[in-house]
Amino acid sequence: MDEFHRCGKEDSFWQQCFLYPLFFQEDLYAISHDHYLDVSSSSRPMEHLSSNDQLSFLTVKRLIGQIRQQNHSIVLFVNCDPNALADRKKSFYSESVLEALTLVLEVPFSIRSKYSVEGMNECKSFRSIHSIFPFLEDKFPHSNSILDARIPYSIHPEILVRTFRRWIRDAPSLHPLRSVLYDYRNSPENLQRSIIVVPRVNTRFFLFLLNYYVCECESILFSRLKRSSHSRSLSHGSFPQRTHFHRKIKHIIIFSRRNSLKSIWSLKDPKINYVRYGERPIIAIKGAHLLVKKCRYYLLIFRQFYFHLWSEPYRVCSHQLSKNCSSSPGYFLRVRMNPIFVRTKMLDELFIADLITNEMDPIVPIVPIIGLLAAEKFCDISGRPISKLSWTSLTDDDILDRFDQIWRNLFHYYSGSFDRDGLYRIKYILSLSCAKTLACKHKSTIRVVRKELGPELLKKSFSKEREFDSLPFSSKAAARSQRERIWHSDILQINPLANSWQKIQDLKIENLFDQ
């Protein structure tokens, strides 16, 4: 495999490489066999793991031969009866073949991703979910509209195989992939004409399909946007508005027309910014409403032309940042005006200038979060705290730790908001719900619980505030916390409550367009 990676540095070679012989490498199936046992051993009961789960390379070769035949289809996506030994062995070898197929297809995909990203400084990938917000703070205040483009998941298996054919010219290596996709589509759990590119049964296989599908969409979209941006020429050959010349010269490129002595001046378009978190791209645009409509129309036509997909209207939504709020991962995003007063003194005269700048203002969705807490039985629908009866069987330390963990995660995730008053309302709900839970467990009252525990009840709840007070210039921490935001870079996934609220928002939009 390492030798294959080294040989893949040449584009002309790895696009025409022969991947099908890799299916008959015993080392490949040894790797997939070990990976399958590691994953399945954590999910299957001990009685289902037997010493007979040994890999037979001869059986694997027979399965590959069955895949190549149209009349013999192996079942990869049906839940087999664990009591039937034959079904279990069949599922075992099917999973091994599926793991090997994923390993083979990951080779050209990893090489392509590595060499396509090189030289593109604007395409960066970060692990933290909060790495998106510094980019939004830099780009959003200069934009007036955003496009919330959601990636469609349903795609026909043959269209998905054709996208692989653009980069893999070894046709026999795609026959197993085609058989697997059609087998999944025709399974009793998924009787439909399209395949859903989301992780469901085999996590590694479907994660690979999702990553490849998103990468293919972005690569084609970026190339088209760059081509359209560089091909638009100005109606006049002179510079547009010579004011701020040094600023605008950075966004102007010159290229010569063939068989002509004249040069064409073209503007790089710095007004369209693209960012994606997970499977949800966001495009920030600065321009007239007609430009926003053209970009939205282009995205819809782009998906229909390249992937033969009919995108529903709600898949590409446009918002004006000055009037509406857009829902980002767990936040309401808007742009607010921030007035700044500048005093300039020249000799004996004093001038006061009033400047207005735009600033991104992320808002914490307090009311929806309280509704989610009510659904989890921490409070009622009006926000009144109640006891968590399902936790009364736990120890006191476990109850305190669970409530403390919920508050820590919320405060840690929403530390980037200016207004934290709503967070302290949620803190009040959680602390009082914790006291009521302990009182219900000990068949006592809240006053007795607070008297017995004392500061221990609220000690952990104030731990996050102490972290902010320990920052430099702690004497001004209280006033500074209302003006500054802290984006923590160690958050690798969205908060569960914020994720639930985001799914509810997406479902509301889908239901709105389905009516």
UniProtKB/Swiss-Prot annotation:
Its job: Usually encoded in the trnK tRNA gene intron. Probably assists in splicing its own and other chloroplast group II introns.
Gene Ontology annotations for the cellular component aspect, listed alphabetically: chloroplast
Record-linked HAMAP family: MatK
Gene this chain is encoded by: matK
Short name of one Pfam family: MatK_N
Keyword presence, Calcium: no
Record's protein name: Maturase K
A single BP term in Gene Ontology: RNA splicing
Organism annotation: Pinus halepensis (Aleppo pine)
